[in-house]
Amino acid sequence: MHLFSIRFFLLLITFGFCFNSQAAEQPFIEVVTSDSFSVTGINALQQQGLSVKVYNLDDGKRLVAQIGANLPNNQNAAKNVLQQRFKKMGDKQVKAQFILAYQAVTLSTQYGLSRYPAVVFNHGESVVYGETNLVQALRLYQQWKAK
């Protein structure tokens, strides 16, 4: 019985390494872009089981414009309207929206990106600049990785 337990344990460890190595081979992909660029190939990569996250540098400006829309010209009145809007939305919701809206800026700084669009692989391991076709960006990454 003890020998069976050891074999079963070794078998589980072997499968664990196999699954972990397969997961490690699939890159995690983040795209930093703006409204000026049309990113293609997202669905094709997701259908291959790849994780793709797209962050837009214009989301922050868009959120500020949305929240600040139709504010009165008077500064005190505008402040009151904003406070009412934030209260209606809830503090946690407002914070979450701002964090999401500025995530592209945060990632750009974190990864030291010098321009965009940028396709980032594996949390900054490699960056492909200027390519908006994610299938092509992945191909370039795989060629680089194979060298």
Language-model regions: role of each:
Residues F86, G90-S114:
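Thioredoxin-like thiol-disulfide oxidoreductase module
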Residues Y116-V127:
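A short, hydrophobic beta-strand/beta-hairpin element that forms part of a small beta-sheet core
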